[in-house]
Structure formats: C-alpha cells, structure tokens
C-alpha cells in the first residue's frame, strides 16, 4: 500500500500542495485529476522521490520512502514525452534498463511483453519512425521489463486521439491487472480518469476536492468545483459517461 500522510509542498513561498492525505491499495488504478497548475505533477514527483515534501510523510508498505533505496521503492514512471532514446531501435530501448542486471525480466518475459504490447513488427525501427501510440507502447514495455510494483504515468494519453487512445487505455488496464500493479496516472482529462481508474483523486489549488470511485464522483460530486470540472468538461461524451455509471444523462445547466 502507498500512503500519503498530510503532505504539503511549496515553491518560493507559494503553496502547491496543502495537507494531502490518501491511501492507494495494492493493484489499484488511481488517477490524479485536475486543471493545469493544481499540483498534480508535483504530487507525482513527490511519490517518485524527485522532490522532497515540506511537511508530511509518504509510506510504501508502511515504510517511509525517504528511508528506502530506489531499488526497494519498486517505482517506475512513463514520462509524458516518453523519454525514449532516438539513437536506439525499439528493442534496444525496451531492454536498455535491464542490461547486466540479473533478477529482472528474462528473455522470455521480455518477449511476452513485446507480444502483449503488439511491438513485434517494430523491433528494428528507430523511434522517429513510430507513431505516438507506438512510442507509448515502447515506453510501457521499457518500464515493465523493470518489474515495478508501482507504475506512474504522466499524461499517458494527452498526445493521442480516437482509436489509438482507446487502445492505449486498454493496454494500461491489461498491464495493471495482469501484473497486479499499483498504477497512478496524472491527467487533466475527466473522461480518461473516469473510464480508466478504480478511484479518482481530484485536486483544486493544491487541495483534495474529492477522492472516490468514478461512479460515486458522477452520482455525488462533493462540491461545485467537482461538478463543474467533471461534468462540464465531458461535453459530448458526458451523457455516455453518465449512462456508463448508471446515472440519468444531464441536460445543460443541471447536475447529478
């Protein structure tokens, strides 16, 4: 389990996160959702250990993460820009992190991931030859060969559209379930968060507005910010989302 206990963070005297407390269960998919500048990327960086908290403690399996080695944290991230190596081909990118590191993925496990993420036909290609969806799948494969227990994804769908976006969503769900990963996703898109996650953390101005299941957020938004941000931004897909979670479709100006 990952636990955040009264986390606060400021930069240059400006509060970015204020008293954030939550728990993420093993194997759970959680999205951190909010508008630009709300603190969601800072929260991801704190979990990853890139940035230190000003106040509060982050625990992984009941241990303070600042006291754990990077190996014991078992965290890995797929960055928004993929961070792939342009001078290497797809296969070389995938296995780059496990070179000379016994105990990580075997050749058979790497092959299984390549097939799961449908990359077999692209192994000899350079990164510049790939589409956005293919790059995202390579980045996922490169991360998964490291056998993380917690997978962090920074805006994994922001550069994708339509069928490609839905395909990557399916891959994220499949990987998370098959490998029993705790998966934490940063996104600004309510539709992505609601359809991809077991629970959604909604942040406004560095504070928790609601932390709940997608169905509960749709049925019972806890405040006006959640109601407006979630429902108004869904626009065309709004009625489909509400139907998916068993709520009556909204009309303009009405809330659940």
Regions inferred by a protein language model and the residue ranges of each:
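The feature captures the beta-strand-to-loop junction immediately N-terminal to the Walker
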Residues: 33-35
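Conserved ABC ATPase signature
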Residues: 126-130, 134
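ABC ATPase "signature
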Residues: 211-212, 220
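Conserved ABC ATPase "signature" C-loop
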Residues: 205-206
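A short, proline-enriched helix->beta-strand linker immediately N-terminal to the Walker B motif
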Residues: 145-149
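Conserved ABC ATPase "signature" region
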Residues: 105-122, 173-174
């Amino acid at each position: 389990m990952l636990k955040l206990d009264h986390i606060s963070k400021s930069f240059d005297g400006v509060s970015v996160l204020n008293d954030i407390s939550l728990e993420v269960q093993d194997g759970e998919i959680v999205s951190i959702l909010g508008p630009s500048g709300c603190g969601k990327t800072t929260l991801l960086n704190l979990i990853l250990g890139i940035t230190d908290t000003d106040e509060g403690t982050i625990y992984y399996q009941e241990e303070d993460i600042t006291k754990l080695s990077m190996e014991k944290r078992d965290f890995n991230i797929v960055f928004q820009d993929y961070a792939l190596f342009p001078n290497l081909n797809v296969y070389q990118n995938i296995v780059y992190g496990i070179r000379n590191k016994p105990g990580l993925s075997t050749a058979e496990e790497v092959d299984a991931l390549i097939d799961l993420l449908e990359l077999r036909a692209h192994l000899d290609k350079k990164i510049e030859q790939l589409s956005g969806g293919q790059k995202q799948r390579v980045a996922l494969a490169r991360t998964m060969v490291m056998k993380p227990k917690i997978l962090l994804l920074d805006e994994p769908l922001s550069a994708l559209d339509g069928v490609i976006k839905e395909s990557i969503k399916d891959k994220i769900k499949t990987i998370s379930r098959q490998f029993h990963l705790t998966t934490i996703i940063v996104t600004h898109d309510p539709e992505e968060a609601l359809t991809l996650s077991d629970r959604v953390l909604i942040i406004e101005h560095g504070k928790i507005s609601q932390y709940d299941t997608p169905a509960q957020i749709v049925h019972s938004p806890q405040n006006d910010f959640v109601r407006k941000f979630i429902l108004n931004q869904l626009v065309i897909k709004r009625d489909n989302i509400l139907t998916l979670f068993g709520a009556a479709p909204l009309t303009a100006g009405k809330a659940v």
